[in-house]
Amino acid sequence: MTHNTILGILVSSMISLPALAEVKIGYIDMQKAIQETAAGKKAKKDLEDEFNKKKKDLEKKEADIKKMHEDFEKRSMAMNEDARMKKQNEIRTEMGKYQETAAKAQMEIQKKERDLTQPIVTKLRSILEDIAKKEDFTVVLEKSENSVMWAKKEIDLTDRLIKAYDSKK
């Protein structure tokens, strides 16, 4: 190798080292941030209340169907074929309605969860962007099973994000 080539490699490596030293990385746990903000806790409670109400309604319908089925079992021997078929169809119809109601309730709960958490996520992202710009972070990663395998606790911005969110009510 010529002297100029070696000098070029040496100079270029020196130039790139300071650039690497200026990279500032942080991460957040978005799920934790959502769950631990005051708004997130309220959303969780509202969601649990809605879920428990729907669950109670479904449990009552399930108990009614179970009672219908038990009554049918007790009386089926005394029924003629037409009455037995009619009662079985009635039980099947009620079971189908129950399953539709359960599926609808699940979809409503999922929609409500999205509706409650989306504004929180939007505000968290905005606050995070402010923190990252103000403190000159190069990149902020979201902690999840597949993205951040390990990182120093010092670069975890989650608690700061939660505090900033709750202070901006």
Q: What is each residue range found by the language model?
A:
Residues 149-153:
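Short, exposed beta-strand-loop hairpins at the edges of beta-sheets
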Residues 15-21:
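Sec/Tat signal peptide C-region and signal peptidase I cleavage site
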Residues 22-148, 167-168:
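Amphipathic alpha-helical segments
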Residues 5-14:
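Sec-dependent N-terminal signal peptides
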Residues 1-2:
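N-terminal hydrophobic targeting signals that begin at the initiator methionine
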